[in-house]
């Protein structure tokens, strides 16, 4: 957050516009050299994200990497404008993330770069299903049940934005909750049936 003059992010360097959503203003030109990084976060309670606003030209040279991490607070299918400039040249060679189910994609126009997280593709088929990253039959059953929830449901959203490696443990935790809730419901139903008799 703040304002700087002409800026060049060199190989091994990183540009992060702010801590907990910030806007960095560049009064002049911004250059991302090969091997540099651009790190962005988003507000999980809204549509705001880190952003760089360049008054001159944003020159994105080959090799630059945009990193988006699960700790960044991004929502799936939400479009975030992360860079605006008087003019934009070049593109990021890669965009990386640590999400298990979501892959970031970038869109460019003459003056901006936007980011959207989309469901990763499964080999030979459509989207990666929640069950594709489950290890056991119980985890797969739980994953399939979660996938039937609306995309706006908090449990669905929590699973969809898990970091890599986390889904099996999350499904184990959820299956325990499901069994406990089912058991409680069955016990309540049995008690009510006994009262009727």
Label every model-predicted segment:
Residues 1-81, 87:
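Extracellular beta-strand/loop-rich repeat segments of large surface/secreted proteins
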Residues 70-197:
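Outer-membrane translocation/initiation segment of Type V secreted surface proteins
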């Amino acid at each position: 957050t703040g304002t700087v003059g002409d800026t060049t992010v060199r190989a091994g360097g990183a540009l992060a516009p702010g801590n907990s959503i910030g806007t960095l203003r560049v009064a002049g030109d911004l250059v991302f050299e090969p091997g540099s990084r651009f790190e962005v976060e988003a507000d999980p309670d809204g549509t705001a994200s880190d952003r760089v606003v360049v008054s001159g030209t944003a020159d994105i040279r080959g090799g630059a990497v945009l990193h988006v991490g699960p700790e960044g607070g991004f929502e799936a299918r939400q479009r975030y404008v992360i860079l605006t400039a008087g003019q934009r040249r070049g593109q990021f060679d890669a965009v990386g993330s640590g999400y298990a189910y979501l892959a970031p994609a970038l869109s460019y126009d003459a003056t901006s770069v936007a980011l959207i997280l989309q469901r990763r593709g499964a080999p030979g088929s459509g989207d990666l299903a929640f069950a594709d990253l489950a290890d056991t039959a119980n985890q797969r059953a739980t994953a399939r049940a979660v996938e039937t929830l609306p995309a706006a449901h908090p449990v669905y959203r929590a699973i969809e934005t898990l970091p890599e490696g986390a889904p099996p443990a999350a499904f184990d935790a959820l299956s325990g909750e499901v069994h406990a809730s089912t058991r409680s419901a069955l016990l309540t139903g049995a008690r009510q049936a006994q009262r009727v008799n």
